[in-house]
Amino acid sequence: MLIPLMLSSLVGLSSAPPIRLATCEVSTPNTFQNDNGPTTVGEYTLHVRFSDATSEPISRVLFTLNDGSQVSDVGTFSPGVTINHVLGLSSTDATSCTATIVRFANGAIWNGN
């Protein structure tokens, strides 16, 4: 029983990111001019596509955008499965992001900060 616990704790200490981040794109609303004035369509969103690169399920990934804002993706992310999510954002000037904290289902945490 000690070996699985010890191994899972070491996953949280690894310096390599435990996810493979394939896409991290910020989308902004578009404003169009029409006869009635400007119309805004859409909203600020973060499109992330990633997969768990470990053998342990992940329960939460914190993404930090290049303007310092953060957004979490919470769920059960199984090893090797591609996750493709669009997450809502507040107004932002960000153009990119990185995964900075990953929480595993067993409670271990990887911190890339």
Residue ranges and their predicted role:
Residues 17-62:
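Short, surface-exposed binding/anchoring microloops in extracellular/periplasmic proteins
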Residues 1-12:
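Hydrophobic alpha-helical targeting segments used for export or membrane insertion
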